[in-house]
């Protein structure tokens, strides 16, 4: 049903991308691509296939997910944090332990971002983290994130922070390789 809806929209609008949520296994991504292609929805410059990185298996298997030929990855930091830490962010007793800056979470973010950046795959992050923790946003930029989503009240602040970090990165000498 969802694929039929996407096809119908594509008849009139050619700037539609598809983002697949909660992809647990590489085979699920392969099967999803097969189903889309069987319905005539093939990747092209105006039809991109993205996946959400929201579950720990995405972290461990990011290279394999990239190898399926996806065009982009959007990290769902709220769900990924919740599932890595085993904390229900809506549970009042546990909410204070929900923290995207936890080392396990930041290592996961770094792994996904660096893998995507090294293979030329667009990588973004959605969730509250970039709006709440500027120090985390700086790390995301250093690791090679392509874009971040923030709450409307943080757009200007985050834009300036990213510009500052990118300026520092562009003036930092890079090690020479043989």
Predicted regions and their residues:
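Conserved alpha/beta-domain cores
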Residues: 1-178
């Amino acid at each position: 049903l969802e694929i039929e809806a996407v096809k119908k929209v594509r008849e009139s609008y050619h700037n539609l991308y598809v983002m697949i949520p909660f992809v647990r296994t590489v085979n699920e991504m392969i099967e999803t691509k097969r189903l889309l292609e069987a319905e005539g929805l093939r990747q092209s410059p105006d039809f991109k296939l993205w996946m959400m990185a929201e579950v720990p298996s995405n972290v461990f298997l990011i290279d394999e997910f990239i190898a399926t030929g996806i065009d982009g990855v959007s990290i769902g930091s709220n769900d990924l944090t919740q599932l890595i830490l085993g904390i229900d962010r809506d549970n009042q007793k546990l909410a204070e332990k929900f923290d995207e800056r936890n080392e396990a979470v930041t290592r996961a973010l770094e792994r996904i971002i660096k893998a995507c950046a090294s293979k030329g795959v667009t990588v973004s992050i959605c969730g509250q983290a970039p709006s709440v923790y500027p120090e985390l946003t700086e790390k995301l930029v250093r690791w090679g994130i392509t874009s971040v989503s923030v709450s409307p009240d943080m757009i200007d602040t985050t834009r300036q922070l990213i510009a500052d970090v990118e300026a520092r990165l562009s003036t930092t000498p890079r090690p020479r390789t043989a």
